[in-house]
Amino acid sequence: MLLHSKILGDSENHILILHGFLGSGDNWITIGRKLNFKGFTIHLIDQRNHGRSYHSENFDYQLMSNDLLKYIKHHKIKDPILIGHSMGGKTVMKFSLEFPKLVRKLFVLDISPKEYPIHHQSIIDSLELSLIHIS
């Protein structure tokens, strides 16, 4: 399956923006529009299990890196600039380590390249309980 995105512009120079946990590409629309005016094609990507992209029980950075590779190949993007915020930063770091020749530039925002313990599980559990009560 292919990740959902909003694409702004039609330049040969592509910037792919990946949002943080519980976000979507829409979080970056204002910045995306400004970068588009600078002559770039902007891809505001909804990562797996977020926004309008597909949802799966499988969820890790290896899978998200592979999702990004499929997206880049599908859209025939050459030498993209990658911007990743928080969880998106981890995704683009993983991707860049695996496919360094496919990346022109990398910008990682609000996360560092280290191991983080799982700490969002209580939020996810609460959201699942809320959905059960709504149903």
Indicate where each model-derived feature is located.
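A short loop-to-beta-strand scaffold at the N-terminal edge of the catalytic core in hydrolase folds
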Residues: 1-7
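Conserved HGGG/HGGXW glycine-rich cap/lid loop of the alpha/beta-hydrolase fold
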Residues: 7-54
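Short, conserved structural micro-motifs that define repeat-unit consensus positions
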Residues: 19-26, 47-50, 58-59, 82-94
